[in-house]
A protein has these predicted regions:
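Conserved donor-binding/catalytic core segment of Leloir-type glycosyltransferases
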Residues: 5-7, 179-215
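N-terminal strand-loop element at the rim of the active site
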Residues: 9-16, 28-66, 150-152, 156-158, ...
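An aromatic- and histidine-rich active-site surface loop
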Residues: 68-81, 85-113, 117, 267
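Membrane-proximal helix-turn-helix segments that form the acceptor-binding/catalytic region
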Residues: 78-81, 126-144
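Donor nucleotide-sugar binding/catalytic pocket of nucleotide-sugar-dependent glycosyltransferases
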Residues: 110, 134-175
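Nucleotide-activated donor-binding/catalytic signature segment of Leloir-type glycosyltransferases, i.e.
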Residues: 216, 225-246
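Short hydrophobic beta-strand element within catalytic cores of glycosyltransferases
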Residues: 258, 280-284
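Aromatic "clamp/platform" in nucleotide-sugar-dependent glycosyltransferases that forms part
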Residues: 263-264
Length: 349
């Protein structure tokens, strides 16, 4: 039985985050030939259980996010050195990989995430550190995983390495029968950051009169607070605090008429993959990542004018919207199920 250590997440049971959900489902769909050990943040879990989904849990008393993520990942890597395989999710701890390769015979597999160093939210120093960490991850890993074909292309063009493309599952969100008689609101769900085109979406809806339910961490940043102040008085826009309850999310997603996805960076986004399982039309920001995820079959916008044209022409576009919804579901079922994703990971071990 192969021993696989997973490094780089807050841990399981998943409280939030794409990587945590990935780990929860890798362990849930694990075959009998795999024994996982997952490193967890002692700061995240008040109750520290020893096992979950058949995986052993090891706690490190540091935060998994922010500046502490670097020593958190490094300590996790050092404790993983006797494993058969180390699966690293994200690159922040990869500064330690040259040492790990010297002291361990483990196979190193790294999911480099969504080109974090390119994100506008980071300052110059953090961007440089993340870029260097990415370089180390690619250079010192036996296998590199990319969650989107565009990132696979980036790795090939910049490092000459063939990354393996494995996305995320989304079928865990289906908690019942999806409501086909949709309500009259559009739904959007994301971290409230400029790169997710939050203001573009809000501004367009403020002028259109269409109903929008927008879920996000509005009070976690000055940008989010600014958005609340600017748009909270529009009666057609409902700005909802983060929802982590999967049943509540199911109801919101199930009843929406369409989903608006503003992400412009980060590879394959879990929230997009998840909504595709609901057979809802997707209005996505026009970038290579989103086009790959939706196989060029969503409706795309690059600015307010594009989005408003879709919103203002629902009747004319009804057949296109219906076909889009059917395509989203078909793509989700063929590409984005956790059983398939878990099998793809295990094939690399």
């Amino acid at each position: 039985m192969k021993k696989i250590s997973i490094v780089g997440t807050a841990g399981i049971p998943a409280c939030y985050g794409g990587f945590e959900t990935l780990v929860e489902n890798l362990t849930a769909y694990s075959s009998g030939t795999i024994k996982y050990n997952v490193f967890c943040s002692g700061k995240t879990y008040e109750k520290k259980i020893g096992e979950y989904n058949g995986a052993g849990l090891t706690y490190i008393d540091l935060n998994a996010n922010g500046i502490q993520s670097i020593p958190y990942d490094i300590l996790s890597l050092l404790q993983s050195r006797k494993s058969d395989v180390i699966l690293i999710l994200g690159v922040s701890g990869c500064i330690a990989l040259p040492l790990i390769r010297l002291i361990s015979n483990a196979k190193i597999i790294t999911n480099i995430d969504g080109l974090e160093w390119k994100r506008n939210k980071w300052n110059y120093a953090i961007k440089k550190f993340l870029k260097f960490s990415e370089w180390l991850a690619v250079k010192f890993s036996n296998v590199v995983i990319a969650d989107n074909q565009e990132i696979t292309k980036y790795v090939k063009e910049n490092y000459g390495i063939e990354a393996v493309t494995i996305a995320y599952g989304g079928d865990h969100v289906l908690q019942g029968t999806v409501d086909v008689s949709a309500d009259d609101y559009y739904l959007s769900l994301c971290r409230i950051e400029p790169e997710n085109n939050v203001e573009l979406i809000l501004e367009t809806f403020s002028k259109s009169g269409n109903k929008l339910k927008f879920v996000g961490n509005w009070k976690s940043s000055e940008f989010g607070k600014k958005m609340i102040k600017k748009y909270c008085e529009f009666s057609n826009i409902e700005m909802i605090a983060p929802i982590y309850n999967i049943d509540q999310l199911f109801e919101l997603r199930s009843k929406c008429k369409a989903y608006v996805h503003g992400h412009s960076a980060g590879g394959t986004n879990p929230s997009l993959v998840e909504i595709m399982h609901f057979a809802k039309p997707v209005l996505a920001f026009d970038c290579a990542f989103n086009r790959y995820t939706t196989d060029n079959t969503a409706l795309y916008f690059r600015n307010e004018l594009d989005l408003s044209e879709i919103l203002n022409n629902e009747q004319m576009l009804s057949e296109q919207l219906q076909n889009c919804a059917l395509s989203m579901k078909a793509i989700a079922c063929s590409r984005y199920t956790w059983k398939t994703i878990a099998e793809s990971y295990e094939a690399l071990y």
